[in-house]
């Protein structure tokens, strides 16, 4: 008989799961931001177009077109910044609501994790108590058995003495 630990299989832990798995991933976030502010990528595209045009005109040696493309780059970057500021002002309330929602979700997750942790501790405590009780019963049973054997030896010895003395 083995008197090992209470149970060899570990209990499921509340720390095993990965909560980040269910949250928004990077690609979803990019697409959401693209839907929220569709003019920002347009401004970035215009900026890239102007830089590519300026590079080509510089290679050709056309200074007039190079300056024109650099001005267009400045206008495109100004447009991008203006769109960012306008979009930020427009979506500010939505972002505040989203932060509140995320805070509530985080609080709920924290409380769920705490409750799972407490349940896990209670289960482990109950298992430990049951194991200690089984070990105490086995120890009492062994002690009772030892007392019973000693008593039987005494009785048998007395019986044998009586038989030998009686003869």
From Swiss-Prot:
Q: Which residues form the HIG1 domain?
A: 11-102
Q: Please describe the quaternary structure of this protein.
A: Associates with the respiratory chain complex III/complex IV supercomplex.
Which source organism does the UniProt entry give?
Pyrenophora tritici-repentis (strain Pt-1C-BFP)
Where in the cell is the protein located?
Mitochondrion membrane
One family name in Pfam for this protein: HIG_1_N
- What is the name of the protein in this document? Respiratory supercomplex factor 1, mitochondrial
Known role: Cytochrome c oxidase subunit which plays a role in assembly of respiratory supercomplexes.
Q: Where would you find the membrane-spanning parts of this chain?
A: 39-55, 74-91
Keywords associated with the record: Membrane, Mitochondrion, Transmembrane, Transmembrane helix
What's this protein's family per the entry? Belongs to the RCF1 family.
Q: Name one GO cellular component term.
A: mitochondrial membrane
State the membrane topology: Multi-pass membrane protein
GO terms, biological process: mitochondrial respirasome assembly
